[in-house]
Amino acid sequence: MKLQNSFRDYTAESSLFVRRALVAFLGILLLTGVLIANLYNVQIVRFDDYQTRSNENRIKLVPIPPSRGIIYDRNGTPLALNRTIYQLEMMPEKVDNVQQTLDALRDVVDLTDDDIAGFKKERARSHRFTSIPVKVNLSEVQVARFAVNQYRFPGVEVKGYKRRYYPYNSALTHVIGYVSKINDKDVDRLDKEGKLANYASTHDIGKLGIERYYEDVLHGQTGYEEVEVNNRGRVIRQLKEVPPQAGRDIYLTLDLKLQQYIETLLAGSRAAVVVTDPRTGAILALVSTPSYDPNLFVDGISSKDYSALLNDPNTPLVNRATQGVYPPASTVKPYVAVSALSAGVITRNTSLFDPGWWQLPGSEKRYRDWKKWGHGHLNVTKALEESADTYFYQVAYDMGIDRLSEWMSKFGYGHYTGIDLSEERSGNMPTREWKLKRFKKPWYQGDTIPVGIGQGYWTATPIQMNKALMILINDGVVKVPHLLQSTVEDGKPVPWVQPHEPPVGDIHSGYWEIAKDGMYGVANRGNGTAHKYFASAPYKIAAKSGTAQVFGLKANETYNAHRISERLRDHKLMTAFAPYNNPQVAVAMILENGGAGPAVGTIMRQILDYIMLGDNNTTLPSENPAVTAGEDQ
């Protein structure tokens, strides 16, 4: 046994070794192949991908915000401009102790508790490794103090930014609007519109007025610089720069001095005035009072200040010129006259006797005239001059609500005017369908009668009243009211183009002249309701006044402003144009509850004198219109 086991099978062992070596070799070869294949995949196939990833760690794209376009008035006066402001920023990840740093900054830059609270709020919603504002709008002294102490505050620096500034404060807020910080709602909208990338480094966006409407024109195109950074995120060198394209400057049709002058006339009143050039539709002034300072919103208005504006009973946040809706009252009588003449309901000689009231046929219901004892025999011209309600009650009855609504819609009532502001209401031009939908009730004949004098369910904005007036002045040719005069491209002005709209009625009918002659009589003839304000002017004026009732009077009750609450007093309205034979200016005005100063006719004359004569020394009756209701019909 011992002898037999001492002999080994070298052949078998050799064969086993060879097999094992071959398997090991094949395993090594396979693993080497996998390694080579992976190396090929990384170095050749996915080279661009991994190079991009490497560059993303080493190369950063830093967006450069564009400079926002400047807004000028028609004479080249800047109304909204950019000025450099400095703000203190901190990157918390580069600061050892944020709270200690904030405490140390108190004495250096006059840091307040509100500043610190704002920083912490902003930090909570910011990404890592982003600079967060600590204090905005630093003074030169604060910037200098920090520069001396900057070595003590790693991770903290002062940066300069262009910030919007409105030098004329409240005078233009409802026209220019304002920019403010981009919020989540803005981000969602920009993302849906595919514009978010162009706001990568922009802090503000147009929120209201011209700033909002022409945001795409004013904003510009964001640039960027390609920089190489080290492992700490510090810039080593600049590799490439694509400069931003500044936003385009725009010129408005507004006249700043006229705007400011009208604002002084309306001081203390809730009121609106729209002044246009009827030849072009250009808006020379658009004033709504009271107003507010738009600069409050640029840096972010405080909750206290915003709450005060929001809860102000005089509603300064509302643009009364485009968003205020009121019964247009007797200012619509010239347009009703043109409509009735065009429809063949009346002629220039159609007469009516006015005893001071008009009775609905087949009914005991009487509609009173503002003049208790009546106007006597009337034709359309005299009815306009004396603003006789009874004549237009009859006209409305004969026209019917369907024709009346159709014609007034042609004058722009119940529709947006096309003004280049987003903040506009369409008012209401009532129809049978509207009442059925709104009140679930049919239209009655009695509903039509007050519509004939601009009352009832009819509401309109001052900008609509002005557009209708321009249509009358131009014999039915429609001019869209607009604020943009031109934009600037490559240093050259690009003028705004008036869109074509179909005319209203027959521009050669001669009916327009009848209505305008009635307005001329209002301002110049002895029986005209506003002749005492305008007859003495060295140029000729045509006008139409109106009184919009805030609440109804009982039968045989007399209006007395002294006995009712100020908020229940009648609104005073007026439209006017001048010079009569070659109109260059059209004005629409409303004084809510009669205003707080001179009569509506006095203010209108002062505005027209300022435009036509270049002075503001008009001396006219200045009684508060709340005292007298009848003569301003």
Predicted feature locations:
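Beta-lactam-recognizing serine transpeptidase/beta-lactamase-like catalytic domain environment
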Residues: 2-11, 80, 229-239, 279-331, ...
